Amino acid sequence: MCDLQQWISQYLLDCQYQKGLDPKTIKAYRIDLAQFLELAGQKNFKFTRNEIMAYISRLHQQYKPKTIRRKIASIKAFFGYLEYEGLVQENPFSKLRIKLAIPVILPRTIPLSVISSILASAYQQKETARSQIQRDGTLRDIAVLFATGVRVSELCTLGYDDVRLEEGEIKIYGKGAKERFVQIANPNVLGALHCYQEAYKDVITQSGAFFVNRLHKPLSDQSVRSIVNKYCRLAGVESHITPHMFRHSFATLLLEEGVDIRYIQRLLGHSSILTTQIYTHVAGKKQRDILLEKHPRNKIHFA
């Protein structure tokens, strides 16, 4: 067990410094592997097929299919690392073929009318702001989320040099340290960012982060959630809105406008187009709603 614990520590360091994985991904790996380590320490675990299947059976009793798949993938990747480093002769998970029926959960989106109300409340708040940070920072977060479709974590980790307003683009470091550029096509959003950058140039240069809070510290995920909640409340929006829903809405609305799905894939930073295709289901629902309302056959009635 001692060796296994040491190998896990080495593997997590490799994930951090060699693979450049997202801290949240590494945290999930750490939790999954610690859980597996606990089981391996309870008895003389031999990593045979039967013992591994028994472990997976235990997971089925506690978790949903999506979580089980992630945990298995974490352990499988770990043993792949051990095999590559010559620490084990064979990856006991490599030949396992486990099919899990994972329900497709469609992304939750925000109607454009609701987004408009939220942005309107932010503009109104800007006009009545008591401090400069409130005035210049009011629109930046929600506006950028919807204008670019970035993840909240990507927004919060934007460096000062990553935001290139003269070129109208931002450089994003996505999952797996993958780099991409996203353009800001809306002049109002660009204008708001220009005002913010000019007002806080010294602060954000010193901080290194482009988005800072009133204490001049890098913006956190929780801060963004609080900002979204605030403007939803001011706009009278009763439904639960999360920052990530702006990303879902960004992708779905572009699809509805006929934008090529491969371009949307690049904007979102998805490694596989299969991930992006989930939005076609949401856009398809919108198309059905339009047909129900607008199709001429529905206007023909028989006595």
Residue spans of the language-model regions?
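Conserved catalytic core of the tyrosine transesterase superfamily
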Residues: 1-303
